[in-house]
Curated annotation (Swiss-Prot):
Region ranges (Binding to the cap-specific mRNA (nucleoside-2'-O-)-methyltransferase): 467-533
Places the protein is found: Virion
EC class name: hydrolase
The keyword ATP-binding belongs to this UniProt entry's keyword annotation: yes
GO cellular component: virion component
Oligomeric and partner information: Monomer. Interacts (via C-terminus) with RAP94 (via N-terminus). Interacts with the cap-specific mRNA (nucleoside-2'-O-)-methyltransferase.
Entry function: DNA-dependent ATPase required for providing the needed energy to achieve the termination of early transcripts. Acts in concert with the RAP94 subunit of the virion RNA polymerase and the capping enzyme/VTF to catalyze release of UUUUUNU-containing nascent RNA from the elongation complex. NPH-I must bind ssDNA in order to exhibit ATPase activity.
Chief localisation class: virion
Protein name: Nucleoside triphosphatase I
Swiss-Prot/TrEMBL keywords: ATP-binding, DNA-binding, Hydrolase, Nucleotide-binding, Transcription, Virion
Catalysed transformations (reactions): a ribonucleoside 5'-triphosphate + H2O = a ribonucleoside 5'-diphosphate + phosphate + H(+)
Record-annotated Helicase ATP-binding domain positions: 48-212
Superkingdom assignment: Viruses
Lineage per the UniProt record: Viruses, Varidnaviria, Bamfordvirae, Nucleocytoviricota, Pokkesviricetes
Length: 648
């Protein structure tokens, strides 16, 4: 074990001794009932309150673990450390009433010292700039400051440079650093996913909690490990509290555990029609010409739905384009009103027997071919729904023409019942959600499907879901986790028999007829990001107060505080990565790219990672099957691996 651990362990026990008198209950003044904190909530509160020099902490807890209540408990009892505090709470505007204001009013009588700032509101940030000087001048003389940042990853993402240019939020970020690290002030950050995109976000998060102590670089991560793990860990000791019930990321299957449904992962590789492929190629050219091409916007739209005669926006202004979209939707909606597939056709469709059945109505076959021509994804979605034993969730962020509106036309053709939870259904969605979640609908007999957009990706829960379909990929795993998390909650499946307590997660990956796929591109980006982020999460877990306390639970407490003032002011030495020699065993192979199987290439394979190198540079990664076995073909008695492009 590392040298500093035992000293930090002594300080944790010092804080626990110092705060023995704090109650593990908190009174709800509205209901006049006492709430008992969970052991982990009580533990972290006592450490944060009991250690004066531990001025910063991250609550790295899963969604639903009680971060808000813990923060409110700390607000209530931090006066044990000093009698007068200004409380500054940074949150998303949508979270002001519930949970924050409601929770604070329930447990704290005097809220006059609490100020809210919305980090997603320019007017609220202007308010912060206006009160910044008055807060700064009052510190040390008569008050101390406690800063609380909810969903800190959303704030941090606003600080990361874009195209090497500083973001507008950077001045606010710098002021927060100055206030948080002013003598005797404290900062508490909270997130279930503290890093969502890249290493720069992690550096900025640490820069907020412990300024100038380190700067991690991507080259420190090699083969899924940090080459300077020990140095980083000692710099970050006790920087966070770690509480995650399920550590697997969204792309990893999990078994049923502690009230959480089993998660199965399915990838559906589907081929677009010639018409959809043609429009995709047009969209690709359009994306490359525009400033927002990196967002792959038009390709994503066409991958979902490509109505005939629907052209790329081109030179149309927004009004003209929206009018054209409305007109085309009306045409498509009118066309599908006359389609109502027969029971015999639907049964054959469910079982993938359309091509071999010769007695199906010719009208059904023609209509099916037309619908498939417009969207291979929506056809596959209908097949998954019809084969599901229970209720189905569908994530479709495209609310208008290319998304939910056209998808509902497909459902009508296949007699699939549904509700919609999006920004367009504000007046009806809550009542419909109650009907969908009703006990009598646990098997989806009354309402089979709920289509939801980003409006439903946070803050709501669905019960007894058996399948969730991801029609359009978000850009990072944390958003994906929020989306899938709507269907897998604590005890969300308790009303189903044991054998039905599962959720099948379906990723729809559509390809053109020449194997282009924006879905695959985004999925690969997510996987690459998350591989590095998981290394960071492992570092935070190892540095957490729980990890240290579990080892040194019975060590003699420190007599007074000495260590954290030193830790948070000691900068980790920069590592010269060029001096670090890492030996990797490589094997010569023949391979080809999946999209160009005619060209046979030579390379050196790292069997541990399936990465192929040429001239000391990673150039490709082997494709694997569901059993994690590399895919290959045999040509002229030569084994040839199938690979995708890979960039380090």
């Amino acid at each position: 074990m590392f040298a500093l651990d035992s000293i930090v362990g002594k300080h944790i026990n010092y804080a626990l001794d110092k705060t023995q008198h704090l109650p593990n209950k908190i009174m709800n003044n509205i209901t006049n009932t006492e709430i008992t904190l969970q052991d982990y909530q009580y533990f972290v509160s006592r450490i944060f309150i009991g250690l004066k020099n531990l001025n910063s902490m991250l609550l790295f807890w899963d969604t639903g673990m009680g971060k808000t209540l813990t923060a409110v408990y700390i607000i209530k009892y931090i006066k044990e450390l000093f009698p007068r505090w200004i409380i500054l709470i940074f949150i998303k505007k949508s979270l002001y009433i519930d949970p924050w204001l409601n929770t604070i009013r329930s447990y704290i009588s005097d809220t006059s010292n609490i100020k809210f700032i919305y980090y997603d509101s320019s007017s609220s940030l202007d308010k912060f700039n206006n009160i910044y000087r008055s807060i700064e001048s009052s510190l040390n003389k008569k008050s101390r400051l406690l800063i609380i940042i909810d969903e800190v990853h959303k704030l941090i993402s606003r600080t990361v440079k874009k195209d090497n240019n500083e973001r507008n939020f950077t001045p606010i970020y710098k002021k927060l650093i100055k206030l948080a690290n002013f003598e005797n002030n404290k900062i508490l950050c909270m997130s279930a996913t503290p890093v969502t995109n890249n290493i720069s976000e992690f550096n900025n998060l640490i820069g907020l909690l412990r300024p100038n102590v380190m700067n991690i670089k991507e080259e420190y991560i090699n083969n899924g490990k940090l080459i300077n793990f020990k140095e980083l860990r000692e710099t970050l000791l006790a920087i966070c509290s770690y509480k995650r019930l399920i550590e697997a990321d969204s792309l990893t299957e999990t078994n049923y555990i502690d009230g959480y449904a089993k998660k199965n992962i399915f990838y559906h590789n589907i081929i677009m029609s010639d018409e959809q492929s043609k429009l995709y190629n047009m969209a690709e050219k359009y994306d490359y010409k525009t400033e927002l091409g990196g967002l792959k916007t038009m390709r994503r739209l066409i991958s979902s739905f490509a109505f005939y005669d629907l052209k790329i926006k081109g030179d149309l202004d927004n009004i003209e384009y929206n009018d054209m979209i409305k007109r085309k939707l009306a045409e498509f909606s009118e066309f599908t009103k006359n389609i109502n597939f027969s029971e015999s056709f639907i049964e054959s469709f469910k079982n993938d027997n359309i091509k071999i059945k010769t007695n199906l109505p010719i009208t059904d076959i023609n209509n099916y071919n037309i619908l498939y021509q417009y969207s291979c994804k929506y056809i596959e979605t209908c097949k998954i729904i019809l084969n599901s034993r229970g209720k189905v969730l569908i994530f479709e962020p495209l609310v208008n023409f290319e998304g939910i509106s056209s998808l509902k036309c497909y459902f009508n053709c296949f007699n699939i019942s549904y509700i919609e939870y999006s920004s367009k259904t504000l007046k009806t969605r809550d009542n419909e959600l109650n009907e969908y979640n009703n006990y009598e609908n646990n098997n989806g007999k009354k309402v089979k499907v709920c289509i939801f957009s980003y409006a439903g990706s946070e803050g709501i829960s669905f019960k007894c879901i058996n399948d969730i379909i991801i029609l359009d990929m978000p850009w990072n795993e944390s958003e994906l986790k929020q989306i899938i998390g709507r269907s897998i909650r604590l005890n969300s499946h308790k009303d189903l028999p044991q054998e039905y307590r599962y959720v099948n997660v379906h990723f729809l990956i559509s390809y053109t007829n020449n194997r282009k796929s924006v879905d695959k591109e985004i999925l690969d980006i997510i996987k690459d990001k998350q591989g590095k982020i998981n290394v960071i999460f492992d570092l935070l877990k190892s540095s957490s107060i729980e990890s240290i306390h579990n080892t040194y639970k019975y060590i003699e407490p420190a007599e007074n505080e000495i260590i954290f003032d030193t830790i948070r002011k000691t900068r980790m030495k920069e590592m010269n990565v060029s001096n670090v020699i890492i030996n990797i065993k490589l094997y010569p192979i023949s391979y080809c790219k999946d999209y160009d199987r005619a060209t046979i290439l030579k390379g050196l394979l790292n069997k541990d990672t399936n990465i192929v190198y040429k001239d000391n540079t990673a150039v490709a990664k082997l494709m694997i099957d569901k059993d994690n076995i590399p895919i290959f073909i045999i040509e002229n008695d030569t084994l040839i691996y199938i690979a995708d492009d890979y960039y380090e």
